[in-house]
Amino acid sequence: GSHEWENRLDNGIWTYTLEDIWGGLQDAYADMAADVKKQYDVELDNIGAIGFSAMMHGYMAFGKEDELLVPFRTWRNTITAEASEKLFKEFNYNIPQRWSIAHLYQAILNGEEHVKDITFFTTLAGYIHWQLTGEKNLGIGDASGMFPIDCSKKDYDETMVQKFDALEADRKST
């Protein structure tokens, strides 16, 4: 099944609401069930496994009660140029504006109120996985849309994580 997504510009941010997200998934599931009925004349009532393709970029920040702190910021936003440039200089590694770390760092640079309350942030793909499985994790492909990956370890690049942490510590001390 599929669903035609259309984000909206809300207060200068390209976003989808949580209702858009779940409505889109329901629409895709209904489309898949109708396709199964059409092709095989079978009512779909049980699925052994299912996969979703969702955005591996963007920014969904959550607080201690697992509440969304700010509207979802999609890959389409170009509001993170300052963060992207500063992270490139620090890491000597291209950090596209759509990456989650660019969104987080831009929120930090902007002094956005929600940053102090973040306990977890992820992409749309990570959010859907978490909501369907209860697990807050990403596959390596989706994780590569959040932060640079160390391919040999199949994890985030620890040197760059340390540089990011130092950047934030330096910013707080000035």
Where are these regions (language model features)?
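A short small-residue
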Residues: G1-I13
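Phosphate/oxyanion-binding active-site loops and adjacent basic polyanion-contact surfaces
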Residues: T17-L25
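Glycine-rich phosphate-binding/catalytic subdomain of phosphoryl-transfer
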Residues: G12-T15, D27-S173
